[in-house]
């Protein structure tokens, strides 16, 4: 599990997240544990 707001590149289980734009960050969705998602800034 990762910490909300963390950059996912530092988390092993998040490395699969590929973001064509923006950054891969740890985030939380309803009824799901924190996971990697793409955030465009």
Curated annotation (Swiss-Prot):
Keyword hit for Disulfide bond: yes
Keyword Disulfide bond belongs to the record: yes
Post-translation changes: Contains four disulfide bonds.
Keywords in alphabetical order: Disulfide bond
Recorded superkingdom: Eukaryota
Role noted for this protein: Binds to calcite crystals in the shell and inhibits further shell growth at the binding site.
Official protein name in the record: Perlinhibin
Species for this entry: Haliotis laevigata (Smooth Australian abalone)
Organism phylogeny: Eukaryota, Metazoa, Spiralia, Lophotrochozoa, Mollusca
